[in-house]
Amino acid sequence: MNSEKLHYLTPVQQVDGMLFKREDLYTPMGAGEVNGGKLRQCMLLVDKIHRDYEGVVTCCSIHSPQAPITAATAKAFGLKCQVLYGGTKPETLRQLPMPRLAMRYGAQITIAAKSGRSNILYYIAQRLQRVKDKRDYIILYGINLQEHEDILLGAVAAQVRNIPDEIDNLVLTCGSGITAIGVLAGLKQYHKNVRNVHLVATGPDRRKLIHETLQKYGADRQFHYHDLFHTRGFSYEEPFYSVWGGIKLHPNYEAKTMAWFAKSGLRPEDTLFWITGAEPLAGK
């Protein structure tokens, strides 16, 4: 994978009165395939480690794009890929778009536990013989921030270069926290004056991780944290559909953030909405 593809600067577009950072337009695998900032992070990680391993292993929710992202990346670098799931059945996996897409990219799917909890699956992954023999590398939820912090955060921060120098509101979906950390570090690095950063959480509380990591880089700052994850009735697995000016937002992430934005009182003309990625269509 050449450097130009890995570091492509995605555009900022004005659509129906609001600015969007279009990380969903990072599509090195082609239209409709896995895409976005999380794919770039995974590809940069595997670009760094692929000469030392024969394959990769990941474990995640049956609804998470991490499985097909990891599988597609492994295929691009000529590596094997194994995906560990838990708490499901083979017939269920054959019906769900993310496992199906991972299999289409060549992943070996294993139902490794009765529970789908990430800590249980990670425990099992660590004890795989190929992992113990250092033939396979485990790609974690959050794409291995602790081991490869500089390269991953630097890649996200670099995407801040082309946003406007002055912004009233930046709205960003927050899951694992890596994209949020990288974007906030980029605001400091590229001297962007963003008056209000709104992190809209679709996962567990990452504020401690975000602040501690940014402090190491001298880039810590205040932000508004909006917790959807613990809101009554919220479900990560339940899709929500939203379209803005022809942009179909990811039903598990940005679509839910857009629903929050619609009720927030923020004005579109004062806001940049960061899209981390789009739902891949190839697995449907």
Label for each model-derived stretch:
Residues 149-226, 279-284:
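Glycine-rich phosphate/pyrophosphate-binding loop at beta-loop-alpha junctions
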Residues 224-269, 275-279:
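Active-site-adjacent helical/loop segments in soluble small-molecule enzymes
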Residues 45-50, 68-80, 184-191, 260-267:
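Alpha-helix C-terminal capping segments
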Residues 1-54:
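Positively charged, low-complexity intrinsically disordered leader regions
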Residues 60-68, 90-91, 172-182, 253-257, ...:
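Gly/Ser/Thr-rich loops at beta-strand to alpha-helix junctions
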Residues 45, 68-115, 206-217:
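Active-site-proximal loop->helix
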Residues 88-166, 224-248:
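Small/polar-residue-rich loop-to-helix segments that shape phosphate-bearing ligand pockets
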Residues 52-71, 77-86, 169-176:
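A short, small-residue-rich loop immediately preceding and capping a beta-strand
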